[in-house]
Amino acid sequence: MTLTIKEVTQLINAVNTIEELENHECFLDERKGVQNAIARRRKALEKEQALKEKYVEMTYFENEILKENPNAIICGIDEVGRGPLAGPVVACAPILNSNHNYLGLDDSKKVPVTKRLELNEALKNEVTAFAFGIATAEEIDEFNIYKATQIAMQRAIDGLSVQPTHLLIDAMTLDNALPQVSLIKGDARSVSIAAASIMAKVFRDDYMTQLSKDYPEYGFEKNAGYGTKQHLLAIDDIGIMKEHRKSFEPIKSLL
């Protein structure tokens, strides 16, 4: 009895590798619906394979540390919010489990919102430890954004319930005695830093969404404090509020 296209599609969607797909008994079925199902499954498997390969590449720096010290406790550190006109800069410091596998981890700006939220939930529930650090708009004005970012990162490290032995940091160096590696574009090169990027992004976006409930005119829930047209028009109309960075232009020129 010949299987229906729906039945064949279900079988094809259960295939886990391209090799298995090409050797599947339905591979030579010439029905258009079957061939379309095979093409879709191949595309999905190729995408998954690419994500797996990228994930392996992004464990390079962690593995180099573990070669030297198999018991190393590696903490990734990244920040979000250096560029906005309002709100804090937020850092996150996660320590991944040894069996971590979060396909799709990347620089948070490159990850779609739905996937970002999915990864964030998985990370919060499964990592060995994580903590956030915040430097306020007032501290950014007092110290400058670079120093405030360092402060936020150190606060995240200090908040950890597990003491790390090594730090992987996105494009920064910290006044910290622990061995540290600073990686340019680290959130696209290290799974630990990418995890920090995702978690910090979701945390800060949530913070700005909450802030928008008290200050709806600025559109913080959509612009996260960046200088969008709506945000700039609101500054012109109603002025600035406590979460605005007074050392940033164009706000600085308005004072």
Swiss-Prot record:
Gene3D superfamilies for the chain: Ribonuclease H-like superfamily/Ribonuclease H
Q: What does this protein do?
A: Endonuclease that specifically degrades the RNA of RNA-DNA hybrids.
Which note does the record give on the cofactor? Answer: Manganese or magnesium. Binds 1 divalent metal ion per monomer in the absence of substrate. May bind a second metal ion after substrate binding.
Q: What is the lineage of its organism?
A: Bacteria, Bacillati, Bacillota, Bacilli, Bacillales
EC number annotated for this UniProt entry: 3.1.26.4
Reaction(s) catalysed by this chain, per the record, are: Endonucleolytic cleavage to 5'-phosphomonoester
The protein's GO terms of the molecular function aspect are: manganese ion binding; RNA binding; RNA-DNA hybrid ribonuclease activity
Q: What is its main location?
A: cytoplasm
Q: Listed disulfide bonds for this chain?
A: none
CDD domains in the record, alphabetically? RNase_HII_bacteria_HII_like (cd07182)
Please state which protein family the record places this protein in. Belongs to the RNase HII family.
Q: Where is the RNase H type-2 domain?
A: 72-255
What SUPFAM superfamilies does the entry give? Ribonuclease H-like
Q: Which residues bind a divalent metal cation?
A: 78-79, 170
Q: Which PANTHER family match?
A: RIBONUCLEASE H2 SUBUNIT A (PTHR10954), RIBONUCLEASE HII (PTHR10954:SF18)
Q: What is this protein called?
A: Ribonuclease HII
Location comes to:
Cytoplasm
- Which UniProt keywords are present, listed alphabetically? Cytoplasm, Endonuclease, Hydrolase, Manganese, Metal-binding, Nuclease
One GO location term (cellular component): cytoplasm
